Structure formats: C-alpha cells, structure tokens
Design a protein with these regions (language model features):
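Exported/periplasmic ABC-transporter solute-binding proteins
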Residues: 126-130, 140-213, 220
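Short beta-strand elements in bilobed, periplasmic/extracellular small-molecule ligand-binding domains
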Residues: 35, 65-68, 90-108
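Short beta-strand segments enriched in small/hydrophobic residues
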Residues: 4, 38-39, 65-74
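Hydrophobic alpha-helical
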Residues: 2-19, 85, 104-166
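Flexible loop/hinge segments that line or gate small-molecule binding clefts
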Residues: 10-47, 65, 160-168, 172-173
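Hinge/cleft segment of the Venus flytrap/periplasmic-binding protein
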Residues: 73-77, 88-95, 190-241
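Short, solvent-exposed amphipathic alpha-helices that sit
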Residues: 48-52, 76-96, 110, 114, ...
C-alpha cells in the first residue's frame, strides 16, 4: 500500500512488483491507474474541493481575494482538488478572486514562509485555503501571532490534534478532513480482498471492510471512503487524531 506524491515516478518499481505477483493498493494520492490494482480514495475531488470552497466563502462573506497554499506542485491529489476549486469558484462565487497558488512542499518552515509571503504580496487577502495538513498547520502558526489573525480566514484540510489550539484561540474557524484511520482501515481490507481473490479491481466488485461495512469498486478501480467532515469549535474536542 502506498500514497504517491507523483503519478508516474513510482510506476517502474510498482510494475516490477506487480509482475512478481504483488498486489498494489494506493490510497490518499494515486499513481497513474495503469500502475496499480486499486485506489482507495478518501473522497471525490469534487467533494473535497466543494467543502473547502464552501468554508472559505462562508468565512469571508463570499467576496474578496483568496489564495491557495498547496503541497508539492506535482502532487496528484492536490492538483486535482485545486483544479476543481478553481472551477467551483469561477462558476458559483464570482465575487471571490483566486489571486495566487503557492507551494510549501509539505515542509513546515517552507509553508510558514509561504504564508508570510502571501500576506506581503497580497495586502487585500481575505482568505487562505490550504488543502494539506502540513500547510494548514504552518499557516495557522504564522497567522496566530500576526496582525492578520482574525482578519484573514484560513481553512483547508487538517487534523483535529494539530489544529485544536488554533480553533480554540480563534485563528481558524473551521476546516475539514476525512478520518485517516478509516482510510487506512479500508485500504487494508481492500488489499486483503485482492490478495484473497475476493475482488480483482473490476468495476462492480464488492467486499466488506470490517466495521465500515460494504464497499463497491467504481470506475478506474477506485473505492470511495466517503464525504469530508468539518471540524470546528463545537466538535473538535470529540476527536483525537
């Protein structure tokens, strides 16, 4: 089981393993579909993009300049989400202007510095979307001690444990994520189903993933975990991951 930061870079190694009889399951961030047997998708690109756009629109009054702080420029999942966010903003939020997309390479300090640069380069910035757990935490850390705290909204994808302090101190109002434990749990059951021969990765194959219930393989040998979940001051204390 692997999560890929580049859709092509691992394909030669993966295909060598598959030729030797190894079943390959990707999760979180996919390779090219031809390089693996199954992809466990935490949510659809459309769903992840939509929830982040909805949150930032709500937090900035559906008007003003926003920017995106992403991970690596070639990260498969990030780019899919960003493309969908651009489409959703253009179609449904004409008064929101996406002024920049920057990359922190999932490095805390680089993401922290990129946040500072965004605020310096765009003095009228009203919001930042960071669809990466490293990026959103670094951006929150910067905003929490800056004059922009409470003035520039921050949302995206994060974990409750890393974001709890920033929600409680008012730096962040709301963010989203799937349950990573459930994602790994589903990936493990899917891999076992492949190895046992219960499924082949064909569209329409079904299997049971323990306490999560039954799942069906969709197009491009993809299995969908579900919809993203929003975390805020009302519920963040209920989670510990």
């Amino acid at each position: 089981m692997i999560s890929a930061n580049d859709p092509k870079a691992l394909c030669d190694s993966i295909n060598a393993a598959r030729d030797a009889g190894t079943k390959v399951v990707t999760f979180d961030s996919d390779t090219d579909p031809s390089c693996r047997d199954l992809f466990i998708n935490q949510a659809t690109a459309e769903g992840i993009a939509q929830v982040q756009v909805d949150m930032i629109a709500d937090q900035i009054g559906d008007s003003g300049e926003v920017a995106i702080l992403s991970a690596a420029a070639n990260a498969t999942n990030q780019n899919a989400w960003i493309d969908m966010m651009k489409e959703t903003l253009a179609a449904d939020h004409p008064d929101i202007e996406l002024v920049d997309v920057v990359y922190g390479d999932d490095d805390d300090q680089k993401s922290f510095d990129a946040t500072a640069a965004l605020l310096a380069d765009h003095p009228n910035l009203k919001g930042i979307i960071s669809p990466t757990t490293v990026g959103i935490a670094a951006a929150a850390r910067y905003l929490s001690t800056s004059d922009a705290k409470g003035k520039v909204a921050l949302t995206g994808l994060g974990t409750p444990n890393q974001m709890r302090d920033y929600v409680e101190d008012g730096t962040v109002t709301e963010f989203a994520l799937w349950n990573p434990g459930d994602l790994g749990y589903l990936a493990a059951f899917a891999a076992k189903a492949l190895v046992d021969g219960d499924i082949t990765g064909e569209e329409g194959d079904t299997f049971t993933a323990g306490d999560l219930g039954d799942f069906e393989v969709g197009a491009d040998a993809t299995v969908l975990l579900g919809d993203p979940f929003k975390f805020n001051a009302d519920n963040i204390g209920d989670f510990n991951f």
